[in-house]
Amino acid sequence: MEAERLNAIAQQLDDLRARGRELRRYLDYDEKSSKLEEVTRALEDPAVWNNAEKAQELGKEKRQLEDVVHNLRDIESLSSDLKDLFDLAEAEDDEDTLAAVEADIGELQAKVHALEFRRMFSNPMDPNPCFIEIQAGAGGTEAQDWAGMLERMYLRYCERKGFNVELMEESEGEVAGIKGATIKVSGDYAYGFLRTETGIHRLVRKSPFDSNARRHTSFSSVFVYPEVDDSIQIDINPADLRIDTYRASGAGGQHINKTDSAVRITHEPTGVVVQCQNDRSQHKNKAEAMSMLKARLYELELRKRQSEQQKLEDSKSDIGWGHQIRSYVLDQSRIKDLRTNFEVGNTQAVLDGDLDDFIAASLKQGV
């Protein structure tokens, strides 16, 4: 076996073990491990199920603790096993064992990288589910088609990440695409992964809707906000609400268009508007819309506390059309994030949901 190859593998293993130790320190492994035992014991007590809300909170906390503790244990165990195998391969000059070690290093690197990525989730709401609102800008069919492309991009991204998605409401475009849509995303750190997508997305392309194939520029806004659980108190005065019902405009079969099951709620003091049409039951749609409103009002208050430069005035204009975050220039095969200057040339991959590098760059820079 070549000494250079052995040294490279040994260095990789030492580096990964050191990163694993740093993660245990940074993520408070000992404290989280003790807390996991405590929560597990609490859930084993039959009396806890007398309070369904408390049991649900404990179950959620247990899953979050297990995610960290079990992954840290896996990293330590795999690191130790690979070190032992490497020492054996080196001592016995065993090429097959050494090749197996090299193959498994990739798995260890992926586990370490995934936990290191978590260190960038600094927002206390990052572990929560979230909502993605997409709104077409001015420009008619071209802008609406672009909004539809963004909706598809985020659905594909969520599929890649293993997130669960639910289309809360969708307004179809007049010719193609959509005028707007709201998607609920559930999964570990859904909000953390998606929150930096908030802003204006700009598309430049030769329009398929222009008979002269001229270059068109279109804009769509994306707004991501976290779902707020019941432990956070958001007081909503019923007198401040205007509740409208209407017939759903999106796809949903014959039944959905025969009844006024869709619900739109306007919070008069702030101008925040939410709507839901994903269920045939008006009652369920209203409950979901109230949950969305609570999340929006929480995000509004959070931004006020953080003294950000702009208040959220309503559900569509809260971002400001000048706040462009990413430019998609398709005929030049270039997509560039204007905040981080990260750029790629494979435009189709991005539109198919390959957003990891853009999201990682924005989280690293804290945008």
Curated annotation (Swiss-Prot):
Pfam families (alphabetical): PCRF, RF-1
Molecular-function annotations in GO: translation release factor activity, codon specific
Keywords: Cytoplasm, Methylation, Protein biosynthesis
Record flagged with keyword Transferase: no
Residues spanning the signal sequence: none
Modified residues annotated as N5-methylglutamine in this record: 254
Modifications after synthesis and translation: Methylated by PrmC. Methylation increases the termination efficiency of RF2.
UniProt subcellular location: Cytoplasm
Cellular compartments per GO CC: cytoplasm
Protein task: Peptide chain release factor 2 directs the termination of translation in response to the peptide chain termination codons UGA and UAA.
Record family assignment: Belongs to the prokaryotic/mitochondrial release factor family.
Protein name: Peptide chain release factor 2
Lineage: Bacteria, Pseudomonadati, Pseudomonadota, Betaproteobacteria, Rhodocyclales
